[in-house]
């Protein structure tokens, strides 16, 4: 073996490997909006909101519930329910195989998690969509878990909050999935009759059968900044009407301007503002919100090759 190979090339390769392995995977994240390279521990402190441009990144259902509810006294509702391939549906892949893959990827049985707990000491029930599970699509189990959460709210006479993030009805369940639109709408009508508040929080994105049912039936409809909300996607609409859509069409700011939603609240403010709003709706004293102390984080230099 030549001296050049031993003295120059091999040490160079070894240094390169050491350099690569010295940066743990997942420690850095690039903002999809401004492309700033963000330190993961720092990003967690801001609840996955970019500190540079305020872009609200998508987060999972459990993470969303964790940052919203009080830490103590939580209980999951309908956790035992699992989807069934009743129609033996197959497109390019068997539905049961898609379910298995989604369950393995997310660790969840289906695309909605419902949980009872407290918000600033006030009893509430929360549902949150897991968009990573087949695009947060609504099938029989999603509908049933939502209904169980609403029935819990009826039984305990406590407010209900739902965080929507969905592509719509689950096509693999055909009419069974479409039936969930009526099923969830019916139970929300019961909440309204009983005077129990339901707050719908729209997160990026909300489309199809979910936007055409439960997501737009809140007594108060809230959205995160720049969330995409609609029935069909902008591209489909442009191809149908053969016109260029306005800038920002289907963004939450556009919907607020045109009266389709009530307010836009940033993720960091959801707990105190919704807690205050629900207390007013329930005739309760304004809850005290104490922000958790933020410890300073030493941010190391970002890798150049991210």
UniProtKB/Swiss-Prot annotation:
Zn(2+) binds at residues 31, 34, 50, 53. Its main location: cytoplasm. Binds 1 zinc ion per subunit. GO terms for cellular component: acetate CoA-transferase complex. The keyword Lipid biosynthesis applies. It is found in: Cytoplasm. Pathway: Lipid metabolism; malonyl-CoA biosynthesis; malonyl-CoA from acetyl-CoA: step 1/1. Its cofactor is Zn(2+). The keyword Thylakoid does not apply. It catalyses: N(6)-carboxybiotinyl-L-lysyl-[protein] + acetyl-CoA = N(6)-biotinyl-L-lysyl-[protein] + malonyl-CoA. Its EC number is 2.1.3.15. SUPFAM superfamilies: ClpP/crotonase (SSF52096). A zinc finger (C4-type) spans 31-53. Residues 27-296 form the CoA carboxyltransferase N-terminal domain. One of its GO terms (biological process) is malonyl-CoA biosynthetic process. One of its GO terms (molecular function) is zinc ion binding. Belongs to the AccD/PCCB family. Acetyl-CoA carboxylase is a heterohexamer composed of biotin carboxyl carrier protein (AccB), biotin carboxylase (AccC) and two subunits each of ACCase subunit alpha (AccA) and ACCase subunit beta (AccD). NCBIfam families: accD. Component of the acetyl coenzyme A carboxylase (ACC) complex. Biotin carboxylase (BC) catalyzes the carboxylation of biotin on its carrier protein (BCCP) and then the CO(2) group is transferred by the transcarboxylase to acetyl-CoA to form malonyl-CoA. PANTHER family: ACETYL-COENZYME A CARBOXYLASE CARBOXYL TRANSFERASE SUBUNIT BETA, CHLOROPLASTIC (PTHR42995:SF5). This is Acetyl-coenzyme A carboxylase carboxyl transferase subunit beta. It comes from Pseudomonas fluorescens (strain ATCC BAA-477 / NRRL B-23932 / Pf-5). The gene is accD.
């Amino acid at each position: 073996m030549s001296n050049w190979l031993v003295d120059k090339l091999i040490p160079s390769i070894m240094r390169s490997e050491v350099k690569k392995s010295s940066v743990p995977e997942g420690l850095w994240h690039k903002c999809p909006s401004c492309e700033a390279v963000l330190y993961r521990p720092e990003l967690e402190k801001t609840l996955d909101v970019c500190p540079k441009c305020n872009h609200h990144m998508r987060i999972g259902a459990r993470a969303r519930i964790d940052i919203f509810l009080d830490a103590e006294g939580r209980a999951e509702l309908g956790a035992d329910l699992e989807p069934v391939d009743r129609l033996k549906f197959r497109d390019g892949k068997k539905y049961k195989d898609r379910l298995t893959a989604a369950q393995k990827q997310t660790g969840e049985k289906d695309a909605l998690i419902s949980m009872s707990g407290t918000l600033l000491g006030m009893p509430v029930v929360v549902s949150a969509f897991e968009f990573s599970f087949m695009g947060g699509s609504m099938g029989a189990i999603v509908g049933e878990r939502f209904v169980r959460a609403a029935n819990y709210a009826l039984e305990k006479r406590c407010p209900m909050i739902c965080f929507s993030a969905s592509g719509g009805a689950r096509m693999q369940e055909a009419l069974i999935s479409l039936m969930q639109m009526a099923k969830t709408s019916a139970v929300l009508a019961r909440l309204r009759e009983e005077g129990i508040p339901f707050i719908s929080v729209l997160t990026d994105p909300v489309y199809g059968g979910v936007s055409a049912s439960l997501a737009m039936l809140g007594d108060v409809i809230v959205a995160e900044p720049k969330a995409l909300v609609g029935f069909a996607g902008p591209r489909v609409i442009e191809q149908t009407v053969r016109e260029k859509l306005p800038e920002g069409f289907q963004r939450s700011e556009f919907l607020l301007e045109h009266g389709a939603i009530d307010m836009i609240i940033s993720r960091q403010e959801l707990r105190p503002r919704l807690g205050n709003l629900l207390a007013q709706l329930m005739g309760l004293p304004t809850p005290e919100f104490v922000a958790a102390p933020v410890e300073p984080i030493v941010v190391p230099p970002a890798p150049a090759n991210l």
